[in-house]
Regions:
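Short hydrophobic beta-strand segments that form the core of ligand-binding sensory/regulatory domains
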Residues: 7
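Glycine- and acidic-residue-rich phosphate-binding/metal-coordinating active-site segment common to enzymes
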Residues: 72-75, 85-126
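Alpha-helix-centered segments that form part of catalytic cores
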Residues: 35-60, 136-156
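Conserved GNAT acetyl-CoA-binding A-motif
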Residues: 47-57, 80-96, 106, 153-157
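Conserved acyl-donor/pantetheine-binding loop and adjacent beta-alpha core of acyl/acetyltransferases
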Residues: 10-56, 115, 120-128
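Glycine-rich acetyl-CoA-binding "A-motif" of GNAT/NAT acetyltransferases
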Residues: 2-4
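Conserved acetyl-CoA-binding loop-helix of GNAT-fold acetyltransferases
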Residues: 37-39, 56-59, 64-80
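Long, charge-rich C-terminal accessory regions
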Residues: 119-174
Length: 174
């Protein structure tokens, strides 16, 4: 009986650009009006060189606890250490963000409406196939977070409920 699985994806970005958003602060000021302000912004970043991604980690709820999730996670590093020639030098871990009751990204639902027709695609499905349309269609300059819907603002950088244990484990290892 299989109760858990973890995965490693190699050469991500080898056949096309991978994209992600980075949240940061943008400071603005005016000597004339004598003010300084710090704004929350997100900016699209493209990764063109291949990298290895720590992928799926799933453990059946009946078997969670007692370090089993950590074992599944760390097994990936052991595997990479045994066969380093199979993996890229850069290793990335992506944590899935918050989703609604229909399993759609809350952030993407609110952000993408400025650039795409909602009926155009199911974003999760098409982005796993090829997300280059994102880097082709979205401007490269920073976007203010404040115009986004409040629910979208609150969940930027917050992991999906099912990913919280993995997120905490990675943060503790950093």
């Amino acid at each position: 009986r299989i109760v858990g699985i973890s995965a490693i994806y190699t050469s991500v970005s080898k056949n096309g650009t991978s994209v992600f958003f980075k949240r940061k602060k943008k400071n603005i000021s005016s000597k004339v009006f004598k003010f300084k302000k710090s704004l929350d912004v997100i900016q699209l970043h493209a990764v063109k060189e291949p990298y290895t991604e720590l992928g799926t980690l799933f453990l059946h709820p009946d078997f969670r606890g007692k370090g089993r999730g950590s074992l599944l996670s760390l097994a990936r590093f052991k595997f990479m250490a045994l066969w380093p020639e199979r993996f890229d030098k850069k290793v990335v871990a992506e944590i899935r963000g918050k989703v609604d009751k229909d399993d759609n990204s809350i952030f993407w639902k609110h952000f993408s409406k400025y650039f795409f027709d909602e009926e155009m695609f199911n974003n999760n499905e098409i982005s796993y196939i090829n997300n280059s349309f994102i880097s082709e269609s979205i401007p490269k300059h920073p976007f203010l977070v404040s115009p986004l819907n409040r629910s979208a603002q609150r969940i930027i950088g917050i992991p999906n409920d099912n990913a919280v244990p993995a997120f905490k484990m990675m943060r503790s290892q950093n």
